[in-house]
């Protein structure tokens, strides 16, 4: 993937933009498709991971493609319903999922370009799944209540019909750039496979350098996470970015330090307000403090995004350039639709990072016994 050179003067000449360029200097930023909006949906996991895969395709020399986030969401909704019913309703159901769910769905169902399946069935140009989500949840709860005392296989067809109506039918074949594909053959052509990727996290309630099932509500599929030391997690993320890789990022964004309007995320010292001018110190984040915030629900699994670069702030610190899925109207003029995330914020609020196994540090890869 070629590096995107950010030329400040060519992007904007406003005073605000000039101020932004004084506060932040680019270190590296990699190609990504334009910022999109997930609308009124809980599909950040699909938007972020699809964006990540789009950058992966550019990096791998496969060209620029706009992948369908809602095609994958539709298929994952099928998997979630099956899981919910098999567990007699004793598990998470809703719109939320994680990055590995998208990758697994690509393995199982394939993937399609957005122009083939955009999931919009009305005249609206934006997604709103509020009605659909309520109906799907009511449906699976009714199935689980099992008033007929014995389930028939018909419930799956009824559930799929709801998805057909609200999102569209599964496209069995399509033409794209002059070639005929099925969703599976398109994924094969793009060489997208779940086992090419790994998800890393860092918590002290599990042994370091082992894999485990992270206990968070959206891990309904019991996905595996690799546990590493906190400093290794930060080093791995920065090194991957500097070597040409991007990262799918799961994090907490519910705290006052995350400000999408300002386009900056910080961890203010306890009792202080976040200073988005970068003129105040941040809290020192340790592994113990991170664990405490996770254990007491201060930090939860809120939102998935896509890390595409690094910048250096006027305070001398490095910030992650994070592509969001809330549209391109928020944030700094130079980074519309993005949030610049401090290292302290990353340490405190990261749930996990998903990246290509080729991006893993050799020593870390050996410790995790990954091939």
Language-model segments: what does each one mean?
Residues 157-371:
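Active-site signature of cysteine proteases
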Residues 1-21:
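Bacterial Sec-dependent N-terminal signal peptides
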Residues 16-17, 56, 264, 356:
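Hydrophobic alpha-helical segments
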Residues 20-219, 223-231, 235-248, 327, ...:
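Active-site nucleophile-adjacent alpha helix/oxyanion-hole segment immediately C-terminal to the catalytic cysteine
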Residues 15, 59, 65, 126-127, ...:
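Alpha-helix boundary/interfacial micro-motifs
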